[in-house]
């Protein structure tokens, strides 16, 4: 086991604070409408330019072990805020730096760090309650667009495209961000349920121009095993042929004689059918087949529930208004499923999301909810160069997270104003002793720090602006983008309440732990001896 370097007291705390300041100063330059970019070196490819706080924080590793511990703890603030709210990482870092800086003054003066932390925790709890009280719902497309614009560095086009996407697929719909092919941002919306499986044979295509197989008013047969024998399918095919309607077969696979017969029938015009593989694998495949069954009003024909293919009837089949099958995707539009059953299925999947442990599992469950509840929208980010594309994608993703948070918990006045107004909750806060009261004072001063940083980056005088904003009431604040004062919500400067709340809670949590630290332990790196000189190698004539 390697030897350890153990350090105590003010000296090591100062090193930790140095680490906090190095990371926070790198992150804070990105805050506000006039915040600057940070350029990140990459081992492969060109540099990455970003205004995303958490991306900057994740890049920072310091040489000094004790300074690095301080930096990593603040990095945790940014990461946690990003995980919970998806935005507000720079605000969280600025708040953490301020609480640590103010708190260290009191610790150095001899106050009890544990009581200081208790005071900080009480103040933050009161502020969070007040933020919830002053938050207003974010319902309209205009408000959603404003939240998106602010988060995307005052880019109104980004806000507008996110608002349009939410309007089209609903607030539960899946919105993804991808690289575009042009210079402009584009929005692609897939109505209905789409899954990533296409036709099993190109002979099923009936729209040569679009290269798709389109089925109007079709039946949908769902089977959880392979189909290779046409005899198993004949009873169902005969019933569908009598009804004079097309048929989509979704099964684990359709192969051999069964696939050949379906193709021949399709070409001859006897029965319009298309076969596709079921989406997903294993248990996820079963779950997705069940989703499709509920959406189309059919059942999954499975031996597990005592149903067989030979005995299937038209009542077991799902139905839809239209289904389009491409080479790689199938889209079901207007399934005939019962609305109450679809809602119940969505509620069931939402419960699974709450108990899911992996991010991948959660993401897949959320996709299933979206496909049942609304649809899927793809925002294609356009840019002239790859470096600009990455930077724009970062901003669009931040804006998307911010708008989701706004819809969830409402919005408050932006530009650091909400935190200043929430200070009113601390006026009547009773603490146990003078040290806890000092903890409350630390938070009172810290909540000014986001506004101070925004003003400083805009070239203003922070103290003058903070005092003028404090003289006002309600949503009165300073719009740094234009340098004017007024009602922040009317001027379209909104922050999601969830983002502001998460930033404050995570900043106070880590900062409080730092203040109560009195000892730090780091590994002493072993000095390995240099490799011996190779000298002249045999037969090489002494090349050294």
Curated annotation (Swiss-Prot):
Residues annotated as signal peptide: none
Chain positions recorded as ATP binding sites: 30-33, 51, 87-91, 415, 495
Database matches in InterPro entries: Chaperonin_Cpn60_CS, Cpn60/GroEL, Cpn60/GroEL/TCP-1, GroEL-like_apical_dom_sf, GROEL-like_equatorial_sf, TCP-1-like_intermed_sf
Keyword Nucleotide-binding: yes
GO cellular component: a single term: cytoplasm
Predominant location: cytoplasm
Alphabetical keyword list: ATP-binding, Chaperone, Cytoplasm, Isomerase, Nucleotide-binding
Cellular compartments annotated: Cytoplasm
GO molecular function: ATP binding; ATP-dependent protein folding chaperone; isomerase activity; unfolded protein binding
Positions of transmembrane segments: none
Catalytic activity: ATP + H2O + a folded polypeptide = ADP + phosphate + an unfolded polypeptide
Broad EC category: isomerase
Database matches in Pfam families: Cpn60_TCP1
Superkingdom of the source species: Bacteria
UniProt-listed GO biological process terms: protein refolding
EC number: 5.6.1.7
Disulfide bonding pattern of the chain: none
PROSITE patterns reported in the protein's UniProt record: CHAPERONINS_CPN60
Family the UniProt entry places it in: Belongs to the chaperonin (HSP60) family.
Free-text function comment from the UniProt entry: Together with its co-chaperonin GroES, plays an essential role in assisting protein folding. The GroEL-GroES system forms a nano-cage that allows encapsulation of the non-native substrate proteins and provides a physical environment optimized to promote and accelerate protein folding.
Subunit structure: Forms a cylinder of 14 subunits composed of two heptameric rings stacked back-to-back. Interacts with the co-chaperonin GroES.
Protein name: Chaperonin GroEL
Phylogenetic placement of the source organism: Bacteria, Pseudomonadati, Pseudomonadota, Betaproteobacteria, Neisseriales
Gene coding for it: groEL
């Amino acid at each position: 086991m390697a030897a350890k370097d153990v350090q105590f007291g003010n000296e090591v705390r100062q090193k930790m604070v140095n680490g906090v300041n190095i990371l926070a100063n790198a992150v804070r330059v990105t805050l506000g409408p006039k915040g600057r970019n940070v350029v990140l070196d990459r081992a492969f490819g060109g540099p990455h330019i970003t205004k995303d706080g958490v991306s900057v924080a994740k890049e920072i590793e310091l040489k000094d072990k004790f300074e690095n511990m301080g930096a990593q703890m603040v990095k945790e603030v940014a990461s946690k805020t990003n995980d919970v709210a998806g935005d507000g990482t720079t605000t969280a870092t600025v708040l953490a730096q301020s609480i640590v800086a103010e708190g260290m003054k009191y610790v150095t003066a001899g106050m009890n760090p544990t009581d200081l932390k208790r005071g900080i925790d009480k103040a933050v709890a009161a502020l969070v309650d007040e933020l919830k009280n002053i938050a207003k719902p974010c319902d309209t497309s205009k408000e959603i667009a404003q939240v998106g614009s602010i988060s995307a560095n005052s880019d109104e086009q980004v806000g507008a495209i996110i608002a349009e996407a939410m309007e089209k697929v609903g607030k539960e719909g899946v919105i993804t961000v991808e690289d575009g092919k042009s210079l402009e941002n584009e929005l692609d919306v897939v109505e209905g349920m789409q899954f990533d499986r296409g036709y099993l044979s190109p002979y099923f295509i009936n729209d040569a121009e679009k290269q798709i197989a389109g089925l109007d008013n079709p039946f949908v047969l769902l089977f959880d095993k392979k189909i290779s024998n046409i005899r198993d399918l004949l009873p169902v095919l005969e019933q569908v042929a009598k009804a004079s309607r097309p048929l989509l077969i979704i099964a684990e696979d359709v192969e051999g004689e069964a696939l050949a017969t379906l193709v021949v029938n399709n070409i001859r015009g006897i029965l319009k059918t298309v076969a596709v593989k079921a989406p997903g694998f294993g248990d996820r495949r079963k779950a997705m087949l069940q989703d499709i069954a509920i959406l189309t009003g059919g059942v999954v024909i499975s031996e597990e529930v005592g149903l067989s293919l030979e005995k299937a009837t038209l009542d077991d089949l799902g139905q839809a208004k239209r289904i389009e099958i491409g080479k790689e995707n199938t889209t079901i539009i207007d399934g005939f499923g019962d609305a109450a059953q679809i809602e119940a299925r969505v509620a069931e999947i939402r419960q699974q999301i709450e108990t899911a442990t992996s991010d991948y599992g959660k993401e897949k469950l959320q996709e299933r909810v979206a496909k049942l509840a609304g649809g899927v929208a793809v925002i294609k980010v356009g840019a002239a160069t790859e470096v600009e594309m990455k930077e724009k994608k970062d901003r669009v993703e931040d804006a998307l997270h911010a708008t989701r948070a706004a819809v969830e918990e409402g919005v408050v006045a932006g530009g650091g104003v909400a935190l200043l107004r929430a200070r009113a909750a601390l006026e009547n806060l009773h603490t146990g002793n003078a040290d806890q009261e000092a903890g409350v004072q630390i938070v009172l001063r810290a909540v000014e720090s986001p506004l101070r940083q925004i003003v400083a980056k805009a070239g203003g005088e922070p103290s003058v602006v903070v005092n003028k904003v404090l003289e006002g009431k309600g949503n009165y604040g300073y719009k740094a983008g234009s340098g004017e004062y007024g009602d922040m919500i009317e001027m379209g400067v909104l922050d999601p309440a969830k983002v502001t709340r998460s930033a404050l809670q995570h900043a106070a949590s880590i900062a409080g732990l730092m203040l109560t630290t009195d000892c730090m332990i780091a590994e002493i790196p072993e000095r390995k001896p240099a490799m011996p000189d190779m000298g002249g190698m045999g037969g090489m004539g002494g090349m050294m």
